[in-house]
Amino acid sequence: QTIGVLTCWLSCFFGMFNSLYTLYWPLPVSYDRVPLWGSIFFMVGAAVIMVNVLLFTFNLFSTVLSKSNPRSYTFWQFLRAAFGIPRLMKLFGKEDTAAVNLDYNGLPVFIVAVGRGSIDTVINAIVLLTAGVLILVYGLAALFQAPLDPGAVDALIYKNWFWWGLDMVADGNVLMYTAGVWYLLIPMLVGRKLFGESVVRTVIMADLLISMGVWSHHLLGERVQPLFMRLLSGQFITWGEFFTMGLTIFAALMTIWLARPVKLTPPLKFILGSIFGFIIGGMTGLVQANVGLNLVTHNTQWVPGPHFHVLLLIGVGMLVAAVIYALIPMLTKIEIRTPWLVNLHFWGWLVGGVVMAYGMGMAGSRGMLRRTLYETTLYQPYMAVAMVGALLMAVGFLAFLVNIVATLGLMNVLSLFMPEKWLAGRQAPAEA
């Protein structure tokens, strides 16, 4: 994975590969503007990443479904029972005789959510791998003086294929993996079973079906995309995700509510911040997933600001912090050393993220495009506000690093990244 990422990064930094992030056809194979060698190395790196992702997901599924596991399941038993199909069949008077009783002997909701997210991850990896191989074939053909015709590939079909796969990153990696960690950590932290666990399994299945048909919200600004696709996939089916994610958030919050009184520990506090980030980022996504409103917000700073920066930085970022704050005491029996640094991290990151998103969103609503350099001062006040928010986040992150190093010890932290022989004799046990 590291080799693939570095190969992609180096091909852009030194190889000057400059196709847009979306890799819209035929830009990646327009070698009059895209460096040939940079393109080839970028696609090789991307292929390495995608193959590694496929190996990762294979390892996950093979671990859960391993025949050496006394609680082993076939693949279809896993899907049927984990997603609650036997319960649905009972509603219609049918009995699934081959069903596995996951209520007592099987998979926790966390594993079900990870399995569900991994399905999207596999789809994403396959789609991006095929898109990358296609570009690589064109690059190698050009390298050997036998250029292929870019017109042989329909640009609109390519866009739909590309975004169908790429959107699975948001659905599988961001939404479902996040939900799975909520399902795991919240019951552990508050000492109560997850609220509505049986319903949650069905919600996970429903979101799997919905996620297959939402990719067109990335193409609402494409005039050549058929209107019925923009309305059906880009708007109405996309709105279905707000029901599934809303039910997920409701189950998480109700679990905390019914466990009162609860101690607002650092991990629980950051989980609440994560939920807040998904609420804000999800609502701005709802605004964008509208054929009419997207005419105003498409490709503006509104998209990266209050939408996916909030989802990733606040929603996912604070969840990662929650996991770290929860696991360190669990695994090392050492409490986080400085509580006030935890609070500084929390408020600096949360307030900074909201302020940054607000500045970018206000600029976007006034027409500031993303990926565009402005020489005028028209949008500078909004970007100044966004910069203040980013600096607050930096302060919060610095507080986090200082606290973790102080808790575990500098040499113990360095040992995670450096060979042990370099640190021989210098490591000391962390103080409890």
Predicted regions and their residues:
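Cytosolic juxtamembrane amphipathic/interface segments immediately preceding
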Residues: 100-114
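Membrane-interface helix termini and inter-helical loops of multi-pass transporters
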Residues: 222-227, 294-298, 371-372
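Intrinsically disordered, low-complexity, charge-biased terminal/linker regions in eukaryotic proteins
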Residues: 26-30
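Hydrophobic cores of alpha-helical transmembrane segments in multi-pass integral membrane proteins
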Residues: 1-24, 36-65, 79-99, 115-149, ...
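A cross-kingdom feature marking solvent-exposed beta-strand/loop segments within repeated
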Residues: 155-156
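Soluble secreted/lumenal catalytic domains
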Residues: 260-263
